[in-house]
Curated annotation (Swiss-Prot):
One Pfam entry name: Pollen_Ole_e_1
Tissues expressing this chain: Mostly expressed in aerial organs, particularly in expanding leaves, stems, flowers, and siliques.
Keyword Repeat annotated: yes
One annotated Gene Ontology cellular component of this protein: extracellular region
UniProt keyword list: Cell wall, Repeat, Secreted, Signal
Lineage: Eukaryota, Viridiplantae, Streptophyta, Embryophyta, Tracheophyta
Signal peptide location: 1-26
Organism for this UniProt entry: Arabidopsis thaliana (Mouse-ear cress)
PANTHER family listed in its UniProt record: OS10G0148100 PROTEIN, OS10G0149400 PROTEIN
Highest taxon listed in the record's lineage: Eukaryota
Name used for this protein in its record: Proline-rich protein 2
């Protein structure tokens, strides 16, 4: 009997080799985006140096794909160097073989704190266009340079470090060490004798030994098998479904440039001249008070005779309470 080999092994090998070749081809492709950043209004802020104005700024590439339903997706980001230039890499999937972009991509400038900077020349000035191609490497760039104002797009904060002079030398006393004294001669003493404790006296009579207490072993136990009580079957466990949270979709903030309004001059209002009108009040009616009737006369009491006073004269009372 003859066993024929299967023909499926060769197809699997060819598929594996094709996958390796596609991965190597995709890794060899390199897509770079280069550009420069320009400062506007530098003469107004003379305290900021040009290398410090670019420190901390970042450039992000936002692309508008067809399957993203009109939303922008971040494809790459990079920092701006001291000369105002930047270069970063983006995925090669969004670039065709002829160098054309499959998606509409734009460059956005961000401050050192991650806030987006306003675009001065509009959105079309920051659009990514094809520049050159050498082999599998594509070089993309911008239509115009990105412009920003240091007043709106804030860079890193640098402290001004003045050159302080060195402190004066310290006037310290000379370093001296204490004198080492010679050791005294040893003093020999006789050893301390500790007296031994006396032993207890010996017992003269002989001890009387009694027979030991007998030890009875317990009887051999008889083991019986335990009564098996059948358990009721438990109900089947109900596994709760595990709901995974949805994948968050981060939307980049829409940059709305602020509208400039003309200055408003507030009108100056003056208080009008007050017009005082006289207020006429009715006269107060005074009701005369009726006279009170005359009080009756106080009856006359004869003076009380006291043979002798019990107390002396009282001191005079004050007139005020």
């Amino acid at each position: 009997m003859r066993i024929l080999p299967k023909s499926g092994g060769g197809a699997l090998c060819l598929l594996f080799v094709f996958a390796l070749c596609s991965v190597a081809h995709s890794l060899s492709c390199d897509v770079k985006v280069v550009g420069d950043v320009e400062v506007i209004g530098y003469s107004e802020i003379s305290k900021i140096k040009i290398p410090n104005a670019f420190s901390g700024l970042r450039v992000t590439i936002e692309c508008k794909a067809a399957d993203s339903k009109g939303h922008f997706v971040t494809r790459g980001s990079g920092e701006v160097d001291e000369t105002g230039k930047f270069h970063l890499n983006i995925p090669h999937d969004i670039v065709g073989d002829d160098g054309t972009l499959k998606e509409a991509c734009y460059a956005h400038l961000q401050s050192a704190f991650g806030n987006p900077c306003p675009a001065h020349d509009g959105l079309e000035a920051s659009k990514i266009v094809f520049l050159s191609k050498s082999g599998q490497n594509h070089v993309l760039g911008l239509k115009k340079s990105l412009k920003f104002s240091p007043e709106v797009c804030i860079s890193k904060f640098f402290w001004h470090m003045p050159k302080f002079p060195l402190p004066p030398p310290l006037n310290l006393p000379p370093l001296t060490f204490p004198k080492i004294k010679k050791p005294c001669p040893p003093i020999y003493k006789p050893p301390v004798v500790i007296p031994k404790k006396p032993c207890p006296p010996k017992i003269a009579h002989k001890p009387i030994y009694k027979p030991p207490v007998p030890i009875y072993k317990p009887p051999v136990p008889i083991y019986k098998p335990p009564v098996v009580i059948p358990k009721k079957p438990c109900p089947p466990k109900i596994h709760k479904p595990i709901y995974k949270p949805p994948v968050p979709i981060y939307k980049p903030p829409v940059v709305i440039p602020k509208k400039t309004f003309p200055p408003l001059h507030k009108p100056i209002y003056k208080h009008p001249v007050p017009i005082y009108k006289p207020i006429f009040k009715p006269p107060v009616v005074v009701i005369p008070k009726k006279p009170c009737p005359p009080l009756p006369k106080f009856p006359h009491f004869p003076p009380k005779y006291i043979p002798h006073p019990k107390f002396g004269k009282w001191p005079p009372f004050p007139s005020h309470p």
